[in-house]
């Protein structure tokens, strides 16, 4: 239709780009450990024509922004993000630490390499997100949750005073 106005969603679909708001929500679901919402949103993005490599590069960019937020406080104006997206990042990054973000960064880089050898990029993306969720869930397992009590570390073992009997 020559009279049809091209929308930003049309351009994103043609280029295989994801809506940043949806990506921020997806990362938030991963951080929350919500597999169902994560996979449903991924499927929605794939149905919209998502390109796996673009997705992972956008994911890296957002991890960087989450890390910047975690280390330096609220993000000031950013040319590539709307005010609503900045608010979403602010809200979603409340309890994040650099250790998690660094692990997510490394796994994202590895998955970009994996895309070169897998036959189904969509399955690779789904497995990538599930790995992130389970990695985060493992991180959240404290000794008390796993063992029912805090484990004693060598430094915490009470030391008996040894007196010299000379």
Predicted regions and their residues:
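Extended, largely alpha-helical regulatory/partner-binding modules appended to the mid-to-C-terminal parts
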Residues: 1-154
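Acidic, low-complexity intrinsically disordered tails
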Residues: 148-166
